[in-house]
A protein has these predicted regions:
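Conserved ABC ATPase signature
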Residues: 173-179, 183
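Catalytic Walker B motif of ABC-type/P-loop ATPase nucleotide-binding domains
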Residues: 200-203
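Conserved beta-strand-loop-alpha-helix hinge in the C-terminal portion
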Residues: 252-282
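Conserved ABC ATPase "signature" region
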Residues: 96-103, 149-170
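ABC ATPase NBD coupling module
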Residues: 90-92, 103-119, 143, 268-272
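Short helical segment in ABC ATPase nucleotide-binding domains corresponding to the A-loop/adjacent helical element
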Residues: 82, 133-143, 152, 156
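Conserved catalytic motifs of ABC-family nucleotide-binding domains
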Residues: 196
């Protein structure tokens, strides 16, 4: 590893950080309420350098797509945004991640509280099979010991925002595992929304879904972005073009993953500045 300050597990040190030299902050929108920003992020798994000098702004209340070939560090970067990489043995990180201007790796940060603000939806739907649909939505509240006066209203609100209420309102007491794959993924989105996050991280949320279910999830993503910041990893270029406002193209060319280019999605897909970006979005490799 290099001389950048390393952060591993619960032993976090933010006295010195790598300065962002090769980063490509998105050029539209401002980091503000519900906004994210990274500066000079490096990640290692033991001695393997996975990400190098990732500096990126995520404009508030919009969708940022992370695109690039498999193995370039997109999902790892997503984990860094709410410190989920700390669950992986041998993981180490250097750099800074800001949520609403506050460094989430600073000493004394309440990691559990931070993760309530930065929710996550995984690649495969993962409802709790032993719980009903309603219990699944409210599970996060119970785990975080958050008291809610009107659970019925919150349940309807979250399922409505996830585009699922009309489909399940008459069977809230049936198992979450009884739903179709697409419905299960929207149930997981509703579960993430119940704790009122400012940011939602989505790691290929449609990769296991059929086209019709994918469309419904995409519609949900676009609607949610009106009042929250969404970061989505996708290998589907058509999906990236449909749902994201901005894109960052990651690439690993025999070394750690870096950002080749980041800009408005319309620019990335029509007039990218780097030929490697053009080759990727046009399907010449990856």
């Amino acid at each position: 590893m290099d001389d950048a300050t390393i952060q591993t597990g619960s032993n976090m040190n933010t006295d010195a950080h790598s300065s962002p030299q090769g980063g490509n902050p998105l050029d539209e929108g401002r980091v503000g309420i519900n906004g994210l920003q990274t500066k000079g992020v490096h990640v290692w798994f033991n001695k393997h350098h996975v990400l190098e000098d990732i500096s990126l702004d995520f404009p508030a209340n919009s969708v940022t797509g992370l695109i690039g070939p498999s193995g370039c560090g997109k999902s790892t970067f997503l984990r860094v945004l709410n410190r989920m990489h700390e669950f992986i043995p041998g993981a180490a990180m250097a750099g800074e991640v800001f949520l609403d201007g506050k460094e989430i790796y600073a000493p004394g940060v309440d990691v559990t509280a931070m993760r309530l603000k930065v929710g996550r939806v995984f690649q495969k739907p993962n409802p709790f099979p032993s719980m009903t649909i309603g219990q699944n939505v409210l599970a996060g509240l119970k785990l975080a010991n958050i008291k809610v006066k009107d659970k019925d209203s919150l349940l309807e609100e979250c399922l409505t925002r996830a585009g699922l209420w009309k489909e399940v309102k008459d069977r809230l007491k049936t198992s979450g595992g009884s739903l179709s794959g697409g419905q299960q993924q929207r149930l997981c989105i509703a579960r993430a929304l119940a704790v009122k996050p400012d940011v939602l991280l989505m790691d290929e949320p449609c990769s296991a879904l059929d086209p019709a279910s994918t469309l419904k999830v995409e519609e949900t993503v676009v609607q949610l972005s009106s009042d929250m910041t969404i970061v989505i990893v996708t290998h589907n270029m058509q999906q990236a073009a449909r749902v994201s406002d901005h894109c960052a193209f990651f690439l690993s060319d025999g070394g750690p993953g870096v950002i080749v280019e980041a800009d408005r999605t319309s620019v990335i897909f029509s007039t990218p500045s780097d030929p490697r970006t053009a080759d990727y979005v046009q399907g010449r490799f990856g």
